[in-house]
Amino acid sequence: MAGNSIGQHFRVTTFGESHGIALGCIVDGCPPGLTISEADLQVDLDRRRPGTSRYTTQRREPDEVKILSGVFEGKTTGTSIGLLIENTDQRSKDYSDIKDKFRPGHADYTYHQKYGVRDYRGGGRSSARETAMRVAAGAIAKKYLQQEFGIEVRAYLSQMGEVAIDKVDWNEIENNDFFCPDVDKVAAFDELIRELKKEGDSIGAKIQVVATGVPVGLGEPVFDRLDADIAHALMSINAVKGVEIGDGFDVVRQKGSQHRDPLTPQGFRSNHSGGILGGISSGQDIVANIALKPTSSITVPGETIDVNGEPTELITKGRHDPCVGIRAVPIAEAMLAIVLMDHLLRHRGQNQGVVTTTPKI
C-alpha cells in the first residue's frame, strides 16, 4: 500500500489501523538538538483524542505516545524519530454485523475493490484514528517552527452546519469543547449536537487554520508550490472535501482591483491571497480553510449492498462523532505545520545564502 508518507526533507510515514495493536509513525529529517519530550507531544494528542467530550465519540483511548528512537537525553539526534501509540479501547464486535456490508459514504467499497480485502473493524486503515500519529509528528514540527522561527500554527472551528461564528477571539478557543473562537456561538453548537444525537444523524463543519510568522520565500514552483502542498496535506485529512487558500472560492465574485493585495513600504494592505503569491509565501499570515463532510456513521437506516452485490439496509453501530470537524482542529494544525517544516528545510538547503537589496515588508 503506497501513499503512507508526506514530505521530502521533513518526512512523516504513518502505519496502523483503527482496531489494530497500535499506531505508529517514523519522522525523518528533524534537525538535531531540538528539545522534545513525550509530554510535548501529548498536549496536542490530548486535544485530538476521543472520549474527552460529550460532543465526540465515546471511544476512550488515552493516546499516550512513546518515543522509541531519535531522541537522546531530551534532544533530537537527527536520526529517525519513532513514535508509537497503543490501541486500548477497541470494540471490534460492534462491527461484526457489517463485515459483509459496505457502509455508504465510507471507504469500505473502494478499499474492497482496490485491495480485494479490507479490515472492517472501525474502517481499518481508512479510519481517522490514523490521524493521531499525524498530530504527534505535527507537534514536533510545531515546536521546531515556534522555537527556531517564531512561527505559530493555530486553528479553530468556524462553522458547523448552518451555525457560523461572527468573531475570532484566539483566547477563547481552548475554553470550550468546540475549539470555537466565538463565545456567543458555543451554546448554538451545543444545541445542534444535542439535536443530532437525538436524531442519530451527523453534520459537516468548516475549520480555519492560520500560521503566523512565516517568512517570505517558502515554496518550490512550479509543482511543489506552497499552496499546492498545503492543499494536498489538508485534503488528505479524513472527511475533508474542500480546501481554500486565502479568500478561496470567494474570489469568483471579486474584481482584480479588490482582490490584489497592495504593497506599501509598511507592508501589505490586505491578505486576500492567504499569504501565498505564485506558490511562494509572502511573509503574511498563511490562511487556509477546510470543509469536512458529515460522517456516514449514523443510526439512520441507509441503503447499501453486500459483498455479493445484493441490496440490503444498514444501521451503523459503534461509537462515532456527530461532527468530525471538532476533533479535526488539531489535525489541521499538524498538517500545516508538517508542510511548513518541510518547506523551511528545503528553502534553507537551497536558498539560505540568497540576499536581495529589496527590504522585506
Swiss-Prot record:
The keyword NADP applies. Pathway: Metabolic intermediate biosynthesis; chorismate biosynthesis; chorismate from D-erythrose 4-phosphate and phosphoenolpyruvate: step 7/7. It comes from the Bacteria. Transmembrane segments: none annotated. One of its GO terms (biological process) is chorismate biosynthetic process. GO terms for cellular component: cytosol. NADP(+) binds at R48, R54. InterPro entries: Chorismate_synth (IPR000453), Chorismate_synth_AroC_sf (IPR035904), Chorismate_synthase_CS (IPR020541). Its cofactor is FMNH2. PANTHER family: CHORISMATE SYNTHASE. Belongs to the chorismate synthase family. NCBIfam families: aroC, PRK05382.1. This reaction introduces a second double bond into the aromatic ring system. Homotetramer. This is Chorismate synthase.
